[in-house]
């Protein structure tokens, strides 16, 4: 399923990037072999951080913190570190969507029937029809059939359940982006309030609350030759 989702992303990219109306406005790019080094190019350039994991179903990472520190605003669920980011920046500076962990648990307990949500969300049938028609697969109507069956059959990550809420949050993003002074203020607040996620704070708190380790002063006593001769090594510390 993961490989099929990647194929789906690239299929969307083929359509969007070939649309002349989108030229200079929007491009879809899949970053293969994503790692920290590549992230160093993405984090400073991002305006919006999409943290779309279903509440309670994903281990917390640090990518959302790095986006926040670089001034990107967050659209996300109450999952992982998103909760702490929202607490730091305030509700008005975070684009929240989706059910809570308790809401997901209740939905699962009641018996989740994703197919019943299709008719209640006007945009959802259109999206599913585009996928089913082969619009993103060069006319191949069967390529993404497993993806459709997964979504409409049992939807283990409750994607359809959070879809309408996500659209509303994206509308709020568009309105904020149109008001550039407001957006810039929100961006600055995200950076200014990211201190909670610094490694200094984390290590200090681990020392105090978990490791219960005391500070131990270290004194380095060695002479350093400020102008060493070529090929000459500095003396090692005792």
Indicate residue ranges for each PLM-predicted region.
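Catalytic binding pocket for nucleotide-activated donors in carbohydrate/polymer assembly enzymes
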Residues: 44-46, 52-187, 191-201, 205-227, ...
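Catalytic cores of eukaryotic secretory-pathway lumenal/extracellular enzymes that build
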Residues: 1-40, 45-48, 224-228
